[in-house]
UniProtKB/Swiss-Prot annotation:
Enzyme Commission (EC) number: 3.5.2.6
GO MF term set: beta-lactamase activity; penicillin binding
Keyword set includes Signal: yes
Organism: Pseudomonas aeruginosa
Catalytic activity: a beta-lactam + H2O = a substituted beta-amino acid
Protein name: Beta-lactamase OXA-3
Gene expressing this chain: bla
Pfam families per UniProt: Transpeptidase
Residue positions binding substrate: K210, T211, G212
Disulfide partners: none
Modified residues (N6-carboxylysine): K75
Homology family: Belongs to the class-D beta-lactamase family.
Length: 275
């Protein structure tokens, strides 16, 4: 009898919690117009925490649960890994350019963590990955519950060409932990990474974000901080026209955030087109 009562109570708790979570998620099919305006196919998840009750808004919920390569959005957790493992000391450490000419001119010079994040300097993170190693990277990924937590690769960087994959919904969960300093890393390291993520700011708001692109899929993830609370976002879109499609990531997100007053009208658009 006791077992049966426990089972009933457990089922009630689990399904009640699930139902409550679902009640907080709203499909915004009307946001299709923002994707159509730029002839883009994709998904966006917005978690608005400016009120007491968090509201999760999503366009294309099915796609928002599908995992893709994180590309350079992975620089957010990867920087935490590097700091924790000692591959990077702080934001002032200079990493000397190896002299190899790469396709992005901004990559062909000495770097620090701030420039590496801003310019999506891949070779810096390749150095970090080599020093950290696959086994330790896997442990880190599992500790932060990041996507499929698989850093294996047969060719290329595991966060671009390898097996690591994450869904837009999972990006939001990770970003929330970072915002609240709830990741298993030193608080000062989490604060530093958030500082590196700043894209722009106004009198009473701050936009922190990171782009990503692996050739077929483009990302923009981050959040806007307001005095009343943060608004998290994670967008991914198909990029059949490759670099010609990259501006659409920020354009769509900004239009959607402005539509719910999570960004001021027509703020300056950052032109980051790195992957």
């Amino acid at each position: 009898m006791a077992i049966r009562i426990f089972a009933i109570l457990f089922s009630t708790f689990v399904f009640g919690t699930f139902a409550h979570a679902q009640e907080g998620m709203r499909e915004r099919s009307d946001w299709r117009k923002f994707f159509s305006e730029f002839q883009a196919k994709g998904t966006i998840v917005v978690a608005d925490e400016r009120q007491t009750d968090r509201v999760i808004l999503v366009f294309d919920q099915v796609r928002s649960e599908k995992r893709y390569s994180p590309a350079s959005t992975f620089k957010i957790p990867h920087t935490l890994f590097a700091l924790d493992a000692g591959a990077a000391r702080d934001e002032f450490q200079v990493f000397r350019w190896d002299g190899i000419k790469r396709s992005f001119a901004a990559h062909n010079q000495d770097q620090d963590l701030r420039s590496a994040m801003r310019n999506s300097t891949v070779w810096i993170y390749e150095l970090f990955a080599k020093e950290i190693g696959e086994d330790k990277a896997r442990r880190y990924l599992k500790q932060i519950d990041y996507g499929n937590a698989d850093p294996s690769t047969s060719n290329g960087d595991y966060w671009i060409d390898g097996n690591l994959a994450i869904a837009a919904q999972e990006q939001i969960a990770f970003l929330r932990k970072l915002y609240h300093n709830e990741l298993p890393f030193r608080v000062e390291h989490q604060r530093l990474v958030k500082d590196l993520m700043i894209v722009e700011a106004g009198r009473n708001w701050i936009l922190r974000a990171k782009t990503g692109w692996e050739g077929r899929i483009g990302w923009w993830v981050g959040w806007v901080e307001w005095p009343t609370g943060p608004v998290f976002f994670a967008l991914n879109i198909d990029t059949p026209n490759r670099m010609d499609d990259l501006f659409k990531r920020e354009a769509i997100v900004r239009a959607i955030l402005r539509s719910i007053e999570a960004l001021p009208p027509n703020p300056a658009v950052n032109s980051d087109a790195a992957r």
